[in-house]
Regions:
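Low-complexity, acidic/polar, glycine-enriched regions of mature
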Residues: 1-191
């Protein structure tokens, strides 16, 4: 795909129509959940993602696939538990996916992605709030152009049959049901 690139970062115009892929060196797929009173952050280190930008923004499409075994919170025992049958069951379900079904512009550089999130073979519709951060030339003339997006959503993990928890004697539960998912990505054009 031959892509014209503005000479500087353009924060207002979407990149040209076509297929763009996640730059794995400049993309983070993270999640945040509460463990009692504190927030625990984690991420997936192995993933693929494509954004197909349409001639009209609402014709665009996003697909993301994460390798569930790549989950890490940088704490081995907790990571092993997240990979177990109590949570992601990575042996049975090696991937989780998001596929957009609709894009709704909500502002000049913001939009909602409606799509199907599949975890453990269970597919549920989610709404993802996203922001276009701009596009422009790569770091050097030899580098391809890049585009950047941020996205976030909140899910109830029990909707995907991740119900493990422990009641705390003083009230409440060990792990929150709600999980925030956040993506920061730079994209490169395909071709």
């Amino acid at each position: 795909m031959a892509t014209e690139t503005p000479e500087t970062i353009d924060r207002n115009a979407l990149p040209p129509a076509g297929t763009w892929t996640f730059d794995k060196n400049h993309t983070r797929l993270e999640f945040v959940a509460r463990h009692m009173l504190s927030k625990v952050r984690g991420r997936f280190t192995e993933f693929d993602g494509t954004v197909t930008i349409g001639e009209r923004p609402e014709d665009s499409h996003v697909e993301v696939e994460m390798q569930t075994a790549s989950i890490t919170t940088d704490t081995g025992m907790r990571d092993d538990h997240l990979r177990s049958d109590d949570f992601l069951e990575v042996e049975e379900y090696p991937t989780m996916t998001f596929r957009s079904t609709e894009l709704r512009p909500t502002g000049e550089n913001t939009f909602q992605l409606v799509g199907d999130l599949t975890i453990k073979g269970i597919t549920r519709q989610v709404v993802v709030d996203a922001e276009f951060n701009g596009w422009g030339p790569g770091a050097s003339p030899d580098n391809p152009p890049l585009a950047a997006f941020s996205a976030k959503t909140e899910i109830d993990r029990e909707d995907w049959d991740m119900t493990w928890n422990v009641a705390v004697e003083t009230g409440g539960f060990l792990v929150s049901k709600k999980v925030q998912i956040e993506i920061e990505t730079e994209l490169n054009p395909v071709g």
